[in-house]
Each structure stands twice: as C-alpha cells, then as structure tokens.
From Swiss-Prot:
A Pfam family per the record: Phe_tRNA-synt_N
A single cellular component GO annotation: cytoplasm
Name of the protein described by the UniProt record: Phenylalanine--tRNA ligase alpha subunit
The protein's assembly and partners: Tetramer of two alpha and two beta subunits.
HAMAP family documented for this protein: Phe_tRNA_synth_alpha1 (MF_00281)
C-alpha cells in the first residue's frame, strides 16, 4: 500500500506539471482526490490494516493528499495569472495617444424657445409663474368661466385622474390660482410656461403633451390696445422687426372679446405660399380681454380692474422659428436633429 501511495503521488504531480489549462487540472483533482479516486479508495481500506500500521499509513495518506492539493492550487494560481497577463497584454492602452473628445450637449430647441420667450416678457416687466401639472377641475375649468355643464368643455378632451382631478389642459389654471392668491395685492403681470395634456392623436401638428406659455395682465384701465402693443413687441423680438400682426375675432370662454393673432408669413413675406396656405398669414396664438366672470370669481371687482390674457404653444413657435415640419421631432431624442440647435 505504501508503494502504491508513492506511485499515485508521483503520477499525480507529473500530470499536474503537464497540464496547460484549468480544465486539465480539474480533471486531475477529480481523478485523484474525488470520491471515486484512488486516495479515497486507500482511506476506505484502512480498516483492514493492523493497529500498528494504521497510524503510519494514515499519516502517509494525508501527506500524499496534501502534496497533490498544494501542487494543484499552485498550478491553478499560475495558470490564472498567465491568463490575466495575456489578456492585459492584448488590452494595453497607449497613454500617449490623444483622448477621445467628449461630445457636448446643447439646449433642446423647446428649452431655447421657452427661454427666449421668457426673456422677451421679463424685459417688459413680467414675472414667471409656475404651477402643478395635476390640477383640480375647478381651477382648470370652473374658475375660468367653464362650469361643468358648459358646452365649450368639449373643445378640449381631458385626461381625468378622478372626477375632480385631472392633468391640466392649459396653464390658465396657474393664472386662476395667481389671481385668487393676489386679489388683495392688486395688479398682476405674469407669464406661465409649462407642460399641458390633451387627448389628441399624435401627428405632425398635434401631441398629447406639449409646452404652453400663457400671459396675464390685471390692472386698472387695461385696454385692448395694451394687448395689441404687447403682442407686437413679442412678435418683432421673436421673429424680426419686419413681421406684421393682425387680430381676428374668435371665441374663448375666459376672454371677452377674444381674438386669434396671425403674423405675416416669414417664407413669402405676405405674398402667399404653401406654409401660409396662400393667405400670407400664419396663426400663432389666441388672446383677449379677461372675462368679467373670471375676474369676479377670483375676487376682483370687474368694474375697477380689467386685464388681458394670451396663450401660445412653444412647439408652434419653435416650428415656425426654425422651420421644423413635424412636432414629433421635438420628442424623438434624435441626436442628429438636436445637434442642429447647438446655437439656438
């Protein structure tokens, strides 16, 4: 038995030395130290030895097993180290090479347009007011002269969360809250930018979510001419000094009288083209004098205070300003499209 153990040890160490891969070493471990290996078989036969031989043979078996185990661990460590070194050799980085430039981002065109619009109105003394996108039905409709049974509610399909809670369909709700909170202080001069939501089918000119910017002025002796002058300044700042405006009668429940504003086409300069559908004019926003009912519901005396309001879509302004033909481009995150506006 002693001679057999020495032979097993020598053979195992030779196989370990010859192994070139981790799989070969695992095969040696299973063959010699596994449950069905010769070392285990010797241990099972220890019971047949005399009491005098058993301690000596037990020590020899342990010595052989430890020698094989130690050599296996050393060889495995060496092979793993060699694998890592070979991998590192193929992945060597030449630190003298120039680094890859980091691509710089840019303002999203909608962000750029909203900031430009804000700058124009801040320059005219307006403040920026913001509000919650999840709104109560009261502030989105009722406080704006749209009671629950008003037929004009059908003009806007709404995302309702509960019977009295919804995703705002316009930022006019910010105006309603501002008027209510400011009735003791008097005059108001604000613009309200923010996301709004309507149940529209997405296409080239419509989106279920879009950016809207509304304006509100409340003070004594406010007239329609003040509204027109304000919008003229805005248009010339945004689209150039040669742009003209015209106001057409319209209807909005929260303003009276109500108008829609067109600007002279920047493509054909009023001569008529495909962009303006041959009219020479392009519609960009709605506006009007604040309805007396809206003033009264907010706590203002409509005989003492008047006001005007206007609202526009940031996407609409951006499409006209930059010649974008599909509103969906603003939301597809196409880097090729966005890179065009690095200087926007």
């Amino acid at each position: 038995m002693e001679a057999r153990l020495k032979e097993l040890k020598q053979k195992a160490l030779e196989l370990i030395e010859e192994a070139k891969e981790l799989k070969g070493l695992n095969d040696v471990r299973v063959a010699y130290l596994g449950k069905k290996g010769p070392i285990t078989e010797v241990l099972r036969g220890m019971g047949k030895l005399s009491a005098e031989e058993r301690p000596r043979m037990g020590a020899l078996v342990n010595e052989v097993r430890e020698a094989i185990q130690t050599r296996l661990e050393d060889k495995i460590s060496n092979l793993e180290k060699a694998v890592i070194e070979a991998k590192l050799a193929t992945e060597t980085i030449d630190v003298t090479l120039p680094g890859r430039p980091v691509e710089t981002g840019c303002h999203h065109p909608l962000t750029a347009v909203v900031e430009q619009i804000e700058d124009v109105f801040i320059g005219m003394g307006y403040e920026v007011a913001e509000g919650t996108e999840v709104e109560k039905d009261y502030y989105n409709f009722e406080a704006l002269n749209l009671p629950k049974d008003h037929p004009a509610r059908d003009m806007q399909d709404t995302f309702y969360i509960t019977e009295e809670t919804l995703l705002r369909t316009h930022t006019s709700s910010v105006q309603a809250r501002t008027m209510e909170n400011n009735k003791e202080k008097g005059p108001i001069k604000i613009i309200c930018p923010g996301k709004v939501y309507r149940r529209d089918d997405d296409d080239a000119t419509h989106s279920h979510q879009f950016m809207q910017i509304e304006g509100l002025v409340i003070d004594k002796n406010i007239r329609m001419s003040d509204l027109k002058g304000t919008l003229q300044v805005f248009v010339k700042k945004m689209f150039g000094e040669d742009r003209e405006i015209r106001l057409r009668p319209s209807f909005f429940p929260f303003t009276e009288p109500s108008v829609e504003m067109d600007i002279s086409c920047m493509m054909c300069h009023g001569k008529g083209c495909g962009t303006c559908k041959g009219t020479g004019w392009i519609e960009i926003l709605g506006a009007g004098m604040v309805h007396p009912n809206v003033l009264e519901m907010a706590g203002y005396d409509s005989k003492e205070y008047q006001g005007f309001a206007f609202g526009m879509g940031a996407e609409r302004i951006a499409m006209l300003k930059y010649g974008v033909d599909d509103i969906r481009h603003f939301y597809t995150n196409d880097v090729r499209f966005l890179q065009q506006f690095k200087r926007a």
